[in-house]
Swiss-Prot record:
Protein name: Transmembrane protein 69
Primary residence: membrane
Compartments in which it is found: Membrane
Species this chain originates from: Mus musculus
The keyword Transmembrane belongs to this UniProt entry's keyword annotation: yes
A Pfam match: DUF3429
Domain of life: Eukaryota
Matching InterPro entries: DUF3429 (IPR021836)
Topology in the lipid bilayer: Multi-pass membrane protein
Amino acid sequence: MLHFIQKVSGASSKMLKNPFTVRLGAGRIDILSLKTCLLQNFSSLPPRTWLSPSFQVCMRKIQCYHVSPCNFKKQKAVLPPKKRSTITYLLDSPKPALYITLAGLIPFTAPPLLMVITKSYIPVLAFTQMAYGAGFLAFLGGIRWGFVLPESSPAKPDYINLASSMSPILFSWAAILFSERLNEAIVTLIIGLGIALHNELFLLPHYPNWFKALRIVSTLVAFISFVVTLILENIYPEKGPKRPD
């Protein structure tokens, strides 16, 4: 450290002997001679002899760190794959189940279609549509009962599963009781179909996705067919008996 002070004092004395060059025309001080003098004096020092030992140790530790430029670009978040909608599994259905389900929708759609063609409201066709809807709704309850019977089934034969399978049957029974008042019977079936679909999709989600897709399609077709029948009663004139002989 003493050697460093001596060198600095020697440099200061040399700086006094070599004064700054003043450029009067430019109005500024030329410090080139000062830089040259300092470089000559400090270059003659042995490397790092003028540093204290503690400072040298600190410098060695600092040199161990690697500093790289930070990447401030926003990286795109990796989003999870979008879940498929239940209705998209319709084409994954087994062909026999798909074709039989589509054929089973004909009794729902045929009566209002014939009424539109003949431009008349036919109570017999509306009654047959209602009777088929009652049987269809009871069949949905039986599906749930049969689904819980196998030992390997994910749905267990507990009170929730077995009791939920009875609700479609009760709505079917009520619709048959109201068959004298056809409109009330059709509304009862619409409510029963909606409750059954809600239970199967949200409360009892054990069915395969393709079966859920079939249930959505069949319920929508039945609902639209029943609503069209109720509308046609108020549009077209009534024709034929109210019930089959």
